[in-house]
Amino acid sequence: MSQEPATPLLDTVKTPDDLRKLAPTQLRQLADELRVEMISAVGQTGGHLGSGLGVVELTVAIHYVFNTPEDRLVWDVGHQAYPHKILTGRRDRIRTLRQAGGLSGFTKRSESEYDPFGTAHSSTSISAALGFAIANKLSGRLGKGIAVIGDGAMSAGMAYEAMNNAEAAGNRLIVILNDNDMSIAPPVGGLSAYLARLVSSGPFLGLRDIARRLSRKLPRPLHEAARKTDEFARGMAMGGTLFEELGFYYVGPIDGHNIDQLIPVLENVRDAAEGPCLIHVVTQKGKGYAPAEAAADKYHGVQKFDVITGEQVKAKAAAPAYQNVFGETLAKLADADPTICAITAAMPSGTGVDKFAKAHPDRTFDVGIAEQHAVTFAAGLAAEGMRPFCAIYSTFLQRAFDQVVHDVAIQNLPVRFAIDRAGLVGADGATHAGSFDVTYLATLPNLVVMAAADEAELVHMTYTAALHDSGPIAFRYPRGNGVGVPLPEVPERLEIGKGRIIRQGSKVALLSLGTRLAEALKAADQLDARGLSTTVADLRFAKPLDVALIRQLMTTHDVIVTVEEGSIGGLGAHVLTMASDEGLVDGGLKIRTMRLPDLFQDHDAPEKQYDEAGLNAPHIVDTVLKALRHNSAGVSEARA
């Protein structure tokens, strides 16, 4: 068992009120202890490491200067908020991060008053902080809205939509741009730090305000010239002309690890009479932990690790990860097909597109955190005869639903959607669960929706999608490793809308979609042992349904149970509709649907989440037995 680090100063800080009692000269020590504590905690739990280490000093400075929680602090995405959680009364639970019943890996309203807004998806912070700022302004309450957003999240249009509407908030809105990728900032040094303090100071802002008021009395051409001169001078010295055009007062860039620079700038902005303000800070992912500094990508999200060596504890996988199966399969297909290309929205390794990119870099497009653009870009490619694969996590595809409908489905364009992280995802919890894609995609005309039962099926579905030119097609697959089945040397083109019988029975039929197939087979074994002959079908397609197969099973079995790892409104709803339309429920057939419960499940290990959801073999058996004991009105029959 690892020994917890000595943190004498941090031990005295239970809340930001305690932090504000410290002398400025003590903040450097506090930041060092906070960083050590975070490394120790994440080493025991796993989680997001690099991003949190990069904002330790910034977190200390924000809580020192601003009056949180009255000032509403919103961390974009939220995976960098571990230091924030430690300083806001949750240190005693920090070693429960992402564990069952423990702290969330993101900010969460129900967890603390210091988390005024739940985050996990990117680029929402400015909109939320603007909402807080305007609400307080209208209500006459004190309190600012503060958004901390990374430069990666600034690639999403939503951030600019918020900034374009922010002027009404005035000095109540502060945006802190955490530039940890050096993609925006010029070199940071003593001069830029001096300029940041200068242009955010009270005297400078006062003089600037006087100059502006005087310039308004000038003839219009002179007034415009004065305005442009001010912007040009500040733009030459400081950068940030884009943000000024959006109505923000820009300050920066400043060193996000230098508390002595951060404190005076934050104080100046806090006390500024004008606004909104944007502070540009430059930080380093993994700051203060050598392994993370040396390999930021490998230490963004980590398993449990040895704090001394940085070595992560990873169990040896018995089967390849689903995203790698997809990426490698697509790369092989593209060797023979120059029209295949891959699109990812800032998740190349998470989706397996990095495998494709190594072989076909000219046909790989990482569009950044811009799912809406990714889908319509893919539609344009498809309209011109390319075969685009848009690889997106299920939870993030939600952000582009209108584009799927309007730009792809209505025009019947053959965009291929590779939907990763389908189903429950474990430690990332409700915000990242892929629960809804079948429900919202299978309602759309023209769209084909498949779900892979294992990694071999994923190979077949990737190949099938590549050859499907008559309209859009989607295939979903889960997070993690496959089940260990051999991968086919030659992929099979699946017949659209046709399922398969895995085992034949006569009394009970289990209709599975996706990776619950393994549990359905276990349940069939248990039902057979009870004398209930059970058929198991892998439907493969949520849309179009294999109507012939389902009709045949419904007319030859007493009980039909659909099993899926998606929300209400998915496969089960479509099967029930089909049965109703064809009059197959009129003769006493017992149909039951099993799907995820109608709630947002908290984080836990995936197998425990599915057990809680009632989607494992014992639950399937129980559902069948209850169906056999009841008639369609729910009245128990005389026989067991």
Swiss-Prot record:
InterPro entries in UniProt: Dxylulose-5-P_synthase, THDP-binding, Transketo_C/PFOR_II, Transketolase-like_Pyr-bd, Transketolase_BS, Transketolase_C, Transketolase_CS
GO biological-process terms attached to the record: 1-deoxy-D-xylulose 5-phosphate biosynthetic process; glyceraldehyde-3-phosphate metabolic process; terpenoid biosynthetic process; thiamine biosynthetic process
EC number(s) stated in the UniProt entry for this protein: 2.2.1.7
KW Repressor (keyword) present: no
Binding-site list for thiamine diphosphate: 79, 120-122, 152-153, 180, 289, 371
Protein family: Belongs to the transketolase family. DXPS subfamily.
Matches recorded under PANTHER family: 1-D-DEOXYXYLULOSE 5-PHOSPHATE SYNTHASE-RELATED, 1-DEOXY-D-XYLULOSE-5-PHOSPHATE SYNTHASE, CHLOROPLASTIC
Binding-site list for Mg(2+): 151, 180
Domain of life the protein comes from: Bacteria
Any single Pfam family the record assigns to this protein: DXP_synthase_N
Record text on cofactor binding: Binds 1 Mg(2+) ion per subunit. Binds 1 thiamine pyrophosphate per subunit.
Subunit structure: Homodimer.
Pathway membership: Metabolic intermediate biosynthesis; 1-deoxy-D-xylulose 5-phosphate biosynthesis; 1-deoxy-D-xylulose 5-phosphate from D-glyceraldehyde 3-phosphate and pyruvate: step 1/1
Keyword Transferase among record annotations: yes
SMART domains: Transket_pyr
Cofactor: Mg(2+); thiamine diphosphate
Reaction(s) catalysed by this chain's protein: D-glyceraldehyde 3-phosphate + pyruvate + H(+) = 1-deoxy-D-xylulose 5-phosphate + CO2
UniProt GO molecular function: 1-deoxy-D-xylulose-5-phosphate synthase activity; magnesium ion binding; thiamine pyrophosphate binding
Role summary: Catalyzes the acyloin condensation reaction between C atoms 2 and 3 of pyruvate and glyceraldehyde 3-phosphate to yield 1-deoxy-D-xylulose-5-phosphate (DXP).
CDD domains, per database record: TPP_DXS, TPP_PYR_DXS_TK_like
Protein name (Swiss-Prot/TrEMBL): 1-deoxy-D-xylulose-5-phosphate synthase
Keyword annotations of the record: Isoprene biosynthesis, Magnesium, Metal-binding, Thiamine biosynthesis, Thiamine pyrophosphate, Transferase
